[in-house]
Amino acid sequence: SLWLDIPIPADAEAGLYEGSVRISGLKNGKRIVADRQFTIQVYPVTLPKQSLLVTNWYFPDKFSFMNDNEYVEDDSPAYWECMRQLVETASAYGQNVWLLYETGTPVPTADGKGLTFDFSRMDKTIEFLLRHADVRLIEANHFAKRSHNGWTDPFWANVPVPDGEGSYVYQRLPYDDPRVQQYIAAYFPALQEHL
């Protein structure tokens, strides 16, 4: 089966409309073509502007599915093309809340013991969403997750921990670990100041 979406302009007159669609592809290495006729009944109804906030999860690390199963590098032209297709399509179907995967790139402090944050990549994504999507709300990325995705599993967080050599490593730590608390104490004030 196939779902065919046909946008109906708000000023379209009610009545029956006829059309056709041609679908082509490959089956067992051979080109196939199918033509189908269809009829659409348009009713004299105009829906009010959507008031519901709608979010759907999307996964940029799965953009390969939109790119002939080829890996899509983050922040590449192919990445932004996949993102554009995704947000424009989802917006057309009513999505207006967007999950922000970028949280700010950690930057070790000069002494190597703490972190500051570079929010330029996050800003780039926000600006992109504002240009290409219906945005009523931007949802921050989930900070803590369940360790095995079960409702009763303990929370953990994947946080950057300074390595003492001017860089950092990500570590998956229990939510109540002092290093997670140190990250929270550095991150949220920096984010608030940036916003």
Model-based region annotation:
Residues 7, 18-25, 32, 36-195:
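Aromatic-lined carbohydrate-binding surfaces of glycoside hydrolases
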Residues 10-14:
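Surface-exposed loops/turns
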Residues 1-4:
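Surface-exposed binding patches on compact interaction domains or structured appendages
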